[in-house]
Amino acid sequence: MPQVSIVVPIYNVERYLSYCLDTLRAQTLRDIEIICVNDGSPDHSAAIAEAHASLDKRIRVINKPNGGLSSARNAGINAARGDYLMFVDSDDYLAEEACESVVSAFESNNADIVTFGAHCVPQKSNNDWLDCVLSPRDRVYREFTEDLLFAESSRPFAWRTAVRKQFIDAHELRFDESVPFGEDQVFHFDIYPLARTTALISDKLYYYRLSRKDSLMSTFANSSKWRVPKHIDIVGAILTHWDERGLMDLCPVRLMDWILDFLCYDLFRLSIDQQKECLAKLGSILESHFEDAVTTANTIFPVMGDIVRTSIELANGSRHDIPRSLARNYTRFRIGLLAMVRDWLRRLFSKDEEGHVEDELENLTERLESEEALGNSLVKLIAQTKSQAYLPQVNNTRSAR
């Protein structure tokens, strides 16, 4: 049996596939299998995969009708014989030491999950958020805590997360084929809470090719009108899975905060009619899965409670409009807070390694206390940060959205 099974979904990638497979065949760890899943690709991708398979017996080609990325990955998972699973999109590629480094992390930590860093191709993404999430720090979680999902650079791309095959089989974990976009986000919310040990490593082992102009990702990135309903579908799938597994009591406030942050910036850029439609759909989902969605959101900040209350009232038909102040208050809260923290981080990171971090934390606390509306939630956050003796490292630690 191979140590690593690499699942490569294939669809319309004839331009990139040969290079991708060459990097997999060149891995320094030789004990691998490469499972190419041809998802009904109409171009010459299947023939390219078969040609590589004729040169390397470690390559297997599975042909199936088109079913989407999740369907292709699941077919690869079901066929895999290795101890560990990795996922590589067929227009991307791996560093030659990737499999060896991942296996080392699994075995040295007895981990169920290993998440690693990635480079963008070309190197400059011009996207601070993307650079952040592709740069995890070195850290091992021996049990699940909410920070793994919400404070680490641990999401949302499945291709930079490897899993122990026995772990996902034992928990019957697969990609959700009902989610046509954002399945990686759902997958991470599924796997992290169930893992005994998760290892994050800062090594950048994957090369992520930035989206082509004609790709689904490009359409997604450039259209809030298209993106928000898809994001709501992602939230619905995550909450459904958590409800089914009895996980909703793990971290309801942190989960709600992430959901609203995930959705609201784009949502309030839509037309009023689109906002009402999306908020009503969101309200129905939140009311179905949270014991008291409004109270949970209000714990974060009052405007968050207002957003959830409005969404639920739109969903059940008890209101038909959106308060004019809702978007304005949300923007003041989020954008004002971000500007304040960004200023603090810039000053903090401009210092040398012996900078007065404690002083900076105290200064920020004082500023937040002067903003009466922000004080309760954010001063508490700084106190927690200090008590955990953890501050972001300049080079490789950032928060994932």
At which residue positions do the language-model features occur?
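N-proximal low-complexity "stem/linker" segments adjacent to membrane-targeting elements
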Residues: M1-R25
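Cell-envelope/extracellular polymer assembly enzymes that use nucleotide-activated donors
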Residues: P2-S5, E33, V186
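A conserved acidic beta->alpha catalytic loop
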Residues: T23, N38-I48, P65
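Short beta-strand/loop segment that forms part of the nucleotide-sugar
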Residues: D31-G40, R60-P65, D89-S90
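Glycine-rich, basic loop-to-helix element that forms the pyrophosphate-binding segment
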Residues: K64-A80
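Donor-binding/catalytic cores of nucleotide-activated saccharide
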Residues: L69, S90-W226, I232-D233, G246, ...
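Membrane-interface aromatic/basic loop that binds lipid-linked glycans or pyrophosphate carriers
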Residues: R269-R401
